[in-house]
Amino acid sequence: GCGDINAACKSDCDCCGNSVTCDCYFTDCKCRESAIRKQF
């Protein structure tokens, strides 16, 4: 999940859902499609 690496962003990433990955840029949480999702 998003909080595995970017723990500080976990609360922000919760809105991303299971189909995206979270990247943390300072205080902003960016969401992107996960590699697993793109396989389908």
From Swiss-Prot:
Disulfide bonds join C2-C16, C9-C22, C15-C31, C24-C29. Keywords: Disulfide bond, Ion channel impairing toxin, Ionotropic glutamate receptor inhibitor, Knottin, Neurotoxin, Postsynaptic neurotoxin, Secreted, Toxin, Voltage-gated sodium channel impairing toxin. It is found in: Secreted. It comes from the Eukaryota. Expressed by the venom gland. One of its GO terms (cellular component) is host cell postsynaptic membrane. GO terms for molecular function: sodium channel regulator activity; toxin activity. The presence of a 'disulfide through disulfide knot' structurally defines this protein as a knottin. Insecticidal neurotoxin that reversibly inhibits the N-methyl-D-aspartate (NMDA)-subtype of ionotropic glutamate receptor (GRIN) and inhibits inactivation of insect sodium channels (Nav). In vivo, is highly toxic to insects. Belongs to the neurotoxin 03 (Tx2) family. 05 subfamily. This is U12-ctenitoxin-Co1a. It comes from Ctenus ornatus.
